[in-house]
Amino acid sequence: MARLRKHYDTVVKPALQKEFNYANPMQVPKLQKIVINMGVGEAAQDSKKIESALAELTLISGQKPVSTKAKMSIAQFKLREGQVVGCKVTLRAERMYEFLDRLINIALPRVRDFRGVPGKSFDGRGNYSLGLKEQIVFPEIDYDKVETIRGMDIIFVTTAKSNEEAKALLKGFDMPFVA
């Protein structure tokens, strides 16, 4: 069992049940999935860019990503419908908790001038989005082999009904929010 999963069951879940006065333990919000998305705009001209992005996302997440395709053609961006424009991976269960552990304890402290993650990136339905400007904050990525610095979006999908519940859940996992 992942370290953060055990932490959720023993510490976070009882604390949230007490804080929000849930009658049933099944009402306590939990993390459903983490989606990591990496957009590669240059993939329209060079297909090797998407291959390196897929390889990096595989190293970061520990599972094979899916390439995302353009839904419609946009002439100004020289983009055709069905053309590969990025990649994403959905993490659930043990891999999700292991990734969250590595993100909070290893990757985020390695971000330059890091003071905390913004606390306003909730969507109103208990989901949280986080953007990273560079993929090299993860220790799995070898800095010398990186062709281009790419950012990524990380979306935390929870069963929480409100932003306050979701923020309390992520704070229970020691997510460093800016005050």
UniProtKB/Swiss-Prot annotation:
Species for this entry: Paramagnetospirillum magneticum (strain ATCC 700264 / AMB-1) (Magnetospirillum magneticum)
Record-level Gene Ontology MF annotations: rRNA binding; structural constituent of ribosome; tRNA binding
Protein name: Large ribosomal subunit protein uL5
GO BP: any one term: translation
Gene Ontology CC annotation, any one: ribonucleoprotein complex
Keyword set includes Transcription: no
PANTHER family cross-referenced by the UniProt entry: 60S RIBOSOMAL PROTEIN L11-RELATED (PTHR11994)
InterPro entries (alphabetical): Ribosomal_uL5, Ribosomal_uL5_bac-type, Ribosomal_uL5_C, Ribosomal_uL5_CS, Ribosomal_uL5_dom_sf, Ribosomal_uL5_N
Function field: This is one of the proteins that bind and probably mediate the attachment of the 5S RNA into the large ribosomal subunit, where it forms part of the central protuberance. In the 70S ribosome it contacts protein S13 of the 30S subunit (bridge B1b), connecting the 2 subunits; this bridge is implicated in subunit movement. Contacts the P site tRNA; the 5S rRNA and some of its associated proteins might help stabilize positioning of ribosome-bound tRNAs.
Subunit composition and interactions: Part of the 50S ribosomal subunit; part of the 5S rRNA/L5/L18/L25 subcomplex. Contacts the 5S rRNA and the P site tRNA. Forms a bridge to the 30S subunit in the 70S ribosome.
A matching Pfam family: Ribosomal_L5
Family per record: Belongs to the universal ribosomal protein uL5 family.
Sorted UniProt keywords: Ribonucleoprotein, Ribosomal protein, RNA-binding, rRNA-binding, tRNA-binding
